[in-house]
Amino acid sequence: MDRDEFIKFEPRLATILQNAMENKRISQAYLLFGSPRCPFEEASLFIAQTLNCESGGLACGKCDSCKRFMAGVRPDFYLIDGRIGLIKKDDIITLRDKYSMSSVENKKVSFQRMSYVILQADNILQKVANAMLKFLEEPAPGLTAILTTSNIERVLPTIRSRCEEIRLEAIPRDYLYNKLITDGFNHENSYFLSDMSGDFNRLESIGQDKDFLATVLALDKFIKAYDKSNKEAVFSLMNDAADRLKGSTCYNWFYGGLSRYFKDIMVQDGQFSVYKDSIVKHSCDIEKASKASVLLDESVKESNANMSFTGILARLGLILLNVKE
């Protein structure tokens, strides 16, 4: 994300950051929050790049500092990716040791500010958070923390209270969809990818994952079966999905993809969708679509803590068949 894109897609954050740079009042810790379609990683990296930009304002992308950062030369930057699972205590200890007072004082560096990013900070559990709270509250001089989350209600209060919270804007879905198509992804993959993240590099990576491709195949088969009958849709759930998808990542992709489809039915939004005819066909099933999307969204948020994948699919099947649980 360059300067122009940052200002275009995140105008509020751009204003806050510009004012902070001009007034030399950078927060010790930021917590960026919003929907999954927000550009969490790209915005975080842009903030980190801005902190040392020689222009004194938003990252220019032209000075030596910006060029080094964009080239991956970032000795005083660290990133923990909580999107891939729970953040472990060892991750925080490594981070704390890197930026401890003694290690900073013993290094001869030419930085203005150091920074670290923790993506999906809601994946920090209480026992892990205890290892970083003092470090977050009393950081080494010149150190800025940048945390992100798409589930702010799940971020521990002890962490939230130590951060300046800033809501990000979601990247328009049609923009992501069209960009994915331009980059060579097919319409089915682009339909589901465009609602998964606002970080385009991440979308490209997911779009090439064989497990994601298997998930899209199961989603596509379900939608085509649903167009035929509710019974065929349930059969597809219990065969194409339950038998072929494995692992929590695939399960959450499947829940999220189906939820997006049902929400499009609810609002009759198929303007750029390969499933436009299907969405229109089920315009009378809005109540059913609403119940289904609620179930699927809850399943993602709770990470299937109390029910198996087949159990969730069975509950979805009951909704489609209008059977009370």
Can you annotate each of these PLM segments?
Residues M1-T50, R68, P141-T144, S150-G257, ...:
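Charged, glycine-rich active-site and insertion segments that engage polyanionic ligands
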Residues S100, N130-L147:
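Conserved catalytic/switch belt of AAA+ P-loop NTPases
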Residues D97, K134, S161:
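Conserved adenine-binding aromatic site and its adjacent loop/helix in ATP-hydrolyzing domains
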Residues M1-K127:
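Clamp-loader machinery-focused feature within the broader ASCE/P-loop NTPase space
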Residues L119-L125, N130-E137, E153:
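Catalytic acidic motif of RecA-like/P-loop NTPases
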